């Protein structure tokens, strides 16, 4: 069974380096694409899904923003099973800060340059909300194109979808980005932060074995 995997905003496949995937799963990592100028979200999702063969069975795994993307792909090309990790099933899972950001539209006036690699304030914020106690957080945050980052943040804030109960959700109880109190996940990673694929790989590996094993 093929398993297509999409990482979180700004993160590459290395965030999954500690995960032991079920034997028999053929892993295919879908790397982030830089959005075209003023690209619509639906068009971007189509481009991210181009490597998927709709004529054969497959599963999807998405982390954080990747979890949102795989749900949108699933609407277009139904998967055998979809698991989202440290992500949300619907807008109700967003934090209060995200809701304030969406309503205020402040993100629209923030210049793209504010998200470049030399932006100390932005990357300090990333460290704080992902895992403030992990000094290696930026090791996994390698996709740093400023237009991609700003565009992605806008799409997360604007994302609107009806919850699909068939989606399997794994959440961490100390996640600041997508607080667990706003969701009703299938699995809870105790003591996990938004960086749980790295710090709680053993627990997540066991869940993936349970859900994907034997498919």
PLM regions and their residue ranges:
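Short glycine-rich catalytic loops that host catalytic nucleophiles or stabilize transition states
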Residues: 30-32, 187-192, 198
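Gly/Ala-rich beta-loop-alpha elbow adjacent to hydrolase catalytic centers
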Residues: 61-70
